[in-house]
């Protein structure tokens, strides 16, 4: 049976404060916790065919618009070629942190709209660091993690819905015996609030987000056993919805159960729109990558979008008119335009790939209604790191129709 730890935290059912809207274009830019310083794919399959709006075009700072071709440094800027990195110095204006271990997850801090500050989670080291352009990365805490599996470690990160008051954050980690959710409070030792999530040789990645009601969404891997994902007695391969104490959210369809959806394999990201209208989870199945719309009390059902070419879907950011997905195999950002009924049609707007991109991407978090923070994992297996990897970047969203001259 899973165990829970009671956290002493004041709860308020508030939406997260919007982090920021950065301009008009997606811009890339174990001890106690210390908070003192605070080629394009061509095989997509959509759900029902309607006529969508065009999604926003993700572009980098200094660019007039997106480009689908072009090196991992995002070298073409508005004013000419951007020099390649020199050691840990990266000249791309989208980059806000460099020379990290593979960054599995990022979160943007609330109240840093025009000058983003974030927290970055390193998968293999267990470190969580504060990142801000122009400042050295500041260690917040280090979690004990087991990295003997290919996909385990520190893989998920989320802030308390009342972070500006309590500075609490949550992390998803792999240990020698299980996967679990940790609560991290300023000046205190990280504590588990949900344990007993099955661990396997694969399928250990778990991801976190907070929904618009202030509850924690936890998407768990299947621990390498698809049967566990459909077993109602197991926490593997599920979407869980818990409160800050690790207990089932009281307004879950079954108030006594944390499970709100079943059938995941290797979730890459979970995200909720700031207006509370949509929540999504990405997943890598044996035959295709998928994006599911989360609806409490309903099965995952037919994916809202599928990628038979398996680009390695990872973190996501949900906007009112589109969903942006980072990929770690294809190494790009794919933006899907939402129809009014919540479905997608057309093909994804692909950007930040090849020479215009940053290589393998993993974590993503929304910043306001037009921006996102993302991370690279080029130092993970299969990556081709440059000297400044791994990095945290900022993306801003330009309305469709804008392009490079």
What residue ranges belong to the model's regions?
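Sequence/structural signature of beta-propeller domains
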Residues: 2-19, 23-25, 33-405
């Amino acid at each position: 049976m899973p165990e829970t730890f009671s956290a002493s935290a004041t709860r308020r059912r508030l939406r997260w404060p919007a982090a920021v809207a950065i301009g008009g274009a997606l811009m890339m830019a174990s001890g106690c916790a210390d908070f003192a310083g605070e080629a394009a794919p061509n095989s997509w399959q959509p759900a029902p065919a309607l006529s969508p709006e065009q999604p926003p075009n993700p572009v980098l700072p200094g660019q007039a618009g997106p480009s689908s071709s072009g090196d991992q440094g995002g070298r073409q800027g508005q004013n000419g070629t951007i020099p390649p990195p020199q050691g840990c110095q990266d000249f791309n204006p989208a980059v806000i942190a460099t020379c990290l271990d593979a960054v599995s997850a990022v979160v943007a801090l609330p109240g840093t709209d025009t000058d983003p500050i974030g927290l970055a989670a390193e998968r293999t080291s267990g470190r969580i660091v504060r990142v801000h352009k122009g400042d050295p990365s500041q260690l917040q805490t280090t979690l004990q993690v087991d990295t003997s599996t290919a996909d385990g470690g520190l893989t998920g990160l989320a802030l308390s819905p009342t972070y500006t008051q309590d500075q609490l954050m949550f992390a998803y980690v792999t240990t020698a015996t299980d996967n679990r959710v940790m609560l991290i409070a300023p000046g205190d030792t990280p504590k588990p609030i949900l344990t007993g999530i099955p661990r396997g040789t694969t399928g250990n990645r778990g991801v976190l987000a907070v929904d618009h009601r202030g509850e924690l969404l936890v998407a768990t891997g299947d621990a390498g056993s698809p049967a566990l994902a459909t077993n109602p007695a197991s926490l593997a391969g599920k979407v869980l919805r818990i409160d800050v104490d690790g207990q089932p959210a009281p307004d879950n369809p079954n108030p006594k159960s944390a499970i709100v959806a079943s059938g995941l394999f290797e979730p890459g990201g979970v995200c909720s729109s700031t207006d509370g209208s949509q929540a999504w989870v990405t997943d890598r199945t044996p035959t295709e990558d998928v994006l599911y719309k989360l609806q409490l009390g309903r099965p995952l059902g037919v994916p809202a979008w599928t990628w038979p070419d398996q680009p390695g879907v990872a973190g996501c950011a949900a906007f009112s008119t589109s969903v942006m997905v980072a990929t770690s195999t294809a190494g790009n950002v794919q933006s899907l335009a939402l129809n009014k009924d919540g479905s997608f049609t057309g093909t994804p707007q692909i950007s930040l790939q090849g020479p215009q991109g940053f290589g393998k991407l993993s974590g993503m978090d929304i910043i306001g209604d037009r921006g996102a923070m993302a991370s690279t994992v080029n130092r993970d297996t299969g990556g081709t790191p440059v000297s400044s990897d791994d990095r945290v970047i900022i993306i801003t969203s330009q309305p469709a129709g804008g392009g490079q001259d």
